[in-house]
A protein has these predicted regions:
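A short N-terminal interaction module
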Residues: 1-58
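Conserved hydrophobic residues forming the short capping helix/wall of the S-adenosyl-L-methionine
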Residues: 15, 156, 160, 231, ...
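Residue-level signal for inorganic ion chemistry
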Residues: 30, 68, 98, 126, ...
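Conserved AdoMet
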Residues: 33-107
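Conserved SAM-binding loop
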Residues: 94, 118, 141, 216, ...
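Conserved SAM/SAH cofactor-binding pocket of Class I
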Residues: 97-200
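Mobile active-site "lid"/loop adjacent to the S-adenosyl-L-methionine
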Residues: 192-223
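Conserved Class I SAM-dependent methyltransferase catalytic core
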Residues: 218-281
Length: 284
C-alpha cells in the first residue's frame, strides 16, 4: 500500500520539473481517477492509501502527462456546461469559451422549440448541452469523422438518457448534407486555425488533438466559408447562425456573412476580450 499524500508530492514534483504549470492540480486529478476518490478527500485525509498496483498506474499516468498528453485524454473525461463528457483523441477537447456560445443560444431560445444543427459536432458537447437544457428542442449533430461520431453517441446516452430521441447524428460534410426540414439555429465551432499557425500551438494541442478539428486552411476560414454558404439554404428565414471564430477573424467573417444575406445580431467576447463568437440572422 502507498500513501496518497506521498504519491501526490512525487507526482507534482515530476510534473513541475517538466515545466507543467498546473502540476499539483494535474497530479490530484490523475490520482483521483485512479483511486476513485474525490480530490478533496485525497487532499484532506493524510492517511489515505492506494494499492501498489494503483500506485503504479498513477506513475504511468504521470509519465503520460509529463509528455504533455492532455488530462482530458488521459482520464477520458471533460466537464462542459456542468455535464461530464467522454473524450478521447478523436475529438477536440471542449473549451470554456464555447460555453459562452451555449449560454447565448439558451438565452435566445429559452422556453421555445428550436430545431438545431450542430456542424462539426465532435464530442457532441454543444448540441447535447443545449438539448439537456431545452426540453422541447430537437437537434442534429453533423460530423465528418466516423470515429468521432461514436464518441458523440456515447455522450448522448450519458447526457440525454431516456431522451436520446431528441438528437440524431449524421456522418457528412456540410457541403453534402441534406435536410428536408429547415433549422431554427445552426451552430458550429469549426476548425479555424490557419495552417501556418498550427506549429505554434502548445505541445498539448498540436501533438495530441485531431488536426481535422484544428486546421482551418490557409487563412483559417475554409470550413467557416462552407458553413456560411450552405446555411443560407437550410436555415429558416430569420434563423440564427452561431459561429465560433479565431482571433482577428471577425472583420473577414462578418463580410462573408453579409455577402451571404446574414446580418450580425450578437457578438460574444472571450475571457481575453477577443471576439470569439458571431451570431447572425438570415435575411434571405
Amino acid at each position: 500500500m502507498k500513501y496518497c499524500s506521498l504519491l501526490l508530492r512525487n507526482g507534482e514534483h515530476t510534473l513541475k520539473k517538466s515545466g507543467i504549470l498546473s502540476s499539483r492540480l494535474d497530479a490530484e486529478i490523475l490520482l483521483s481517477s485512479i483511486a476513485g476518490k474525490d480530490r478533496l478527500e485525497l487532499i484532506s485525509k493524510e492517511n489515505l492509501k492506494v494499492s501498489n498496483e494503483q500506485a503504479l498506474d498513477f506513475h504511468n499516468l504521470i509519465e503520460r502527462r509529463k509528455k504533455r498528453e492532455p488530462i482530458a485524454y488521459i482520464i477520458k473525461k471533460k466537464e462542459f456546461f456542468s455535464l461530464p463528457f467522454f473524450i478521447n483523441s478523436n475529438s477536440l477537447i471542449p473549451r470554456p469559451e464555447t460555453e459562452l456560445l451555449v449560454e447565448k443560444i439558451l438565452s435566445i431560445y429559452k422556453n421555445k422549440k428550436p430545431f438545431i444543427l450542430d456542424v462539426g459536432t465532435g464530442s457532441g458537447c454543444i448540441i447535447l448541452s443545449l438539448l439537456d437544457k431545452m426540453p422541447n428542442a430537437r437537434g442534429v449533430g453533423l460530423e465528418i469523422s466516423k470515429d468521432t461520431i461514436k464518441i458523440a453517441k456515447i455522450n448522448a446516452k450519458k447526457v440525454l438518457k431516456n431522451h436520446i430521441f431528441k438528437v440524431k447524428f449524421e456522418h457528412s460534410s456540410i457541403q453534402n448534407f441534406y435536410s428536408k426540414k429547415h433549422f431554427d439555429v445552426i451552430i458550429s465551432n469549426p476548425p479555424y486555425i490557419p495552417t501556418y499557425e498550427i506549429k505554434n500551438l502548445s505541445d498539448d494541442v498540436k501533438n495530441f488533438e485531431p488536426k481535422l478539428a484544428l486546421d482551418g486552411g490557409k487563412d483559417g476560414l475554409d470550413v467557416i466559408k462552407k458553413v456560411i454558404y450552405k446555411s443560407k439554404y437550410i436555415l429558416k428565414s430569420k434563423g440564427i447562425l452561431a459561429l465560433e471564430i479565431g482571433n482577428g477573424q471577425y472583420f473577414k467573417v462578418s463580410q462573408i456573412l453579409k455577402n451571404n444575406f446574414f446580418r450580425t445580431k450578437y457578438l460574444i467576447k472571450d475571457f481575453k476580450n477577443n471576439i470569439r463568437c458571431i451570431l447572425s440572422e438570415l435575411n434571405f
